[in-house]
């Protein structure tokens, strides 16, 4: 009698696990409601989420059209490069991320004055390059190169590496989706600077 009960209990447990595991696995890979497979940032967002680099903004949303803040970017960089952030709330984790990203040399001191501000393209790309150890050489070092501002030099390299479009504006604010694309590219591609 005990054997029958044990076998029945074991069979029920196996059946329950068989039903739960595929559902849990598909839920983990399902992505975000506001990032359809047709979105330019889909592959990048899914990659960053699977690697636990990027979280959504709640309610199964990533908010790819929302502007990325200094705090959000700093936390993503810390997670991507294995730098620990501390805190029990998002505010604490964000603050810790900014401090750690500054310590690593990925953000400059202005990040402390406006951690909740959106980031412009040249600052975000410069930060991504700093984290990935991608050098940015002045354009005057190249044959026929003209003198450019720091921001324009950063975007020049970003364009050469395929991280920015030819018409990208150095001062344009970056969305969470665009930031995901840039970070995904920096993490998964190898770059050759000539």
Language model regions located:
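Phosphate/pyrophosphate-binding loop motifs in nucleotide- or prenyl diphosphate-using proteins
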Residues: 52
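Intrinsically disordered, low-complexity serine/proline/glycine/threonine-rich regulatory regions
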Residues: 9-13
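Positively charged n-region of N-terminal signal peptides that target proteins for export
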Residues: 1-7
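Feature responds to low-complexity, polar/acidic, surface-exposed segments characteristic
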Residues: 3, 14-40, 55-174, 187-194
